[in-house]
A protein has these predicted regions:
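N-terminal Rossmann-fold cofactor-binding loop
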Residues: 35-39, 59-60
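N-terminal Rossmann NAD(P)H-binding glycine-rich loop of SDR-like oxidoreductase domains
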Residues: 6-22
Length: 388
């Protein structure tokens, strides 16, 4: 077996740490460089991960330096944020170094710019998989698997729900209160919900004001919530990989309603040009921190995702829904993608999304191997089919 070296960007962060723990379990990985700017945190993570890990002080924005570092590794795995600051420099550095690459990218606008680097990556012999986490990532592959249920598909809808306050929100507010750090995940939420956003209708992308296009959705608990279109990479990549599908949308609902109003109030300020994404996120976290008793009481399950497709099977119209169960993870798919590339199982070269290069079921089964023991008896995903 060929022993390989991994450069993990964002190695001191939440997602990077868990990806590192998965990667070091593989005999194929001989070394993993945890890269970032916070040297003290990196040293702490190295001690936690073990003998295969070492720290690599580097600023992702310094593309030349990062490319020089990356040349010594077999793959660059990017779990750093915020995404609009880290994804493009990291991908460019990997291409310059001639090193394979994968990331957690969930910013649609950045994903489009990454895809523009496809020819450069091919010229350098680089395989670069973008957006391979939970969503995007697992959901893209669920779509490819679900397409087999139909003879033809009319519409694909990605439904995202964020039930708050969850554990990650509490972490974000605590970090803001103690160090004024503005959580990059919440910056991503603000960036994705601000208008205008795109939907894919009748084979074309069109821009809409999300608050003018709300739809009522029945949630898993039977309640009805209003969901709004949201900008997401799935909306960009699925139509490219499945051109026969002419309608794709991503919709998003936040509960409770008071939290949703607060998020969209800040998002509208961004859209009007009054504040930046980071400033809006800071204002949002400040509001929560000032009145914890109101905003942060109780504990909600957090993020939920499901895919709903309508189409035709044997001459009958049907609606199919599917959702992750045992494969509900962000960091594990990133690690599995890296290992798949390192094994040589991705023959393509260029920049592409996961649905273009991974076989869904075998990928899901490998992800499931890294899930906690208490989840091993659960199904990989849930599904339902309704004839219309």
């Amino acid at each position: 077996m060929v022993r390989t070296r991994v450069l993990l960007l964002g190695g001191s962060g939440r997602f990077g740490e868990y990806a590192a723990r998965c990667l070091v379990r593989s005999d194929r990985v001989s070394e993993i460089g945890l890269a970032g700017r916070n040297q003290e945190m990196l040293k702490r993570r190295v001690a936690e991960i073990g003998d295969k890990a070492h720290s690599v002080p580097v600023d992702i924005q310094d593309t030349d330096r990062l490319a020089s570092v990356a040349e010594k590794y077999d793959i660059v795995v990017n779990a750093a944020g915020p995404e609009w600051e880290t994804l493009l420099p990291a991908l460019r550095a990997a291409i310059d170094a001639g090193v394979d690459y994968c990331d957690l990218g969930a910013d649609a606008r950045v994903a489009e710019r990454q895809l523009e680097l496809d020819s450069q990556a091919r010229d350098r012999g680089v395989a670069a998989v973008i957006g391979i986490g939970y969503d995007p990532g697992i959901d893209n592959l669920l779509v490819m698997h679900a397409l087999k249920r139909f003879d033809s598909v009319d519409d694909i809808k990605f439904r995202f729900q964020l039930a708050l306050p969850d554990e990650l929100m509490l972490e974000a507010v605590n970090a803001f209160s103690s160090s004024a750090r503005v959580d990059s995940s919440w910056q991503l939420v603000m960036s994705n919900v601000k208008g205008p956003v795109r939907v894919y209708r009748d084979g074309s992308w069109i821009s809409v004001n999300p608050l003018d296009h709300g739809i009522d959705l029945e949630m898993t608990d039977g309640s009805i919530k209003t969901a709004y279109p949201v900008e997401a990479p799935e909306l960009i990549t699925i139509p490219r990989c499945v051109p026969q599908v002419r309608n794709v949308s991503c919709v998003f609902t936040i509960t409770p309603p008071e939290m949703s109003k607060l998020v969209y109030r800040e998002a509208e300020r961004i859209s009007r040009g009054e504040v930046s994404v980071k400033e809006a996120s800071r204002s949002f976290l400040e509001t929560l921190a000032r009145n914890r008793e109101f905003w942060l009481t109780g504990k909600a399950p957090g993020w939920d995702m499901r895919i709903v497709m309508t189409g035709w099977k044997d001459g009958r119209q049907a609606r199919y829904a599917c959702w992750p169960i045992r494969i509900a993870s962000t960091s594990i798919p990133l690690a599995v993608a890296a290992l798949t590339i390192l094994r040589g199982d991705v023959s393509m070269r260029g920049v592409f999304p996961p649905e273009a290069c991974f076989e869904p079921m075998s990928f899901f089964e490998e992800v499931a191997l890294y899930m906690p023991p208490e989840d091993q008896d659960k199904p990989l995903y849930g599904e339902s089919m309704t004839w219309m």
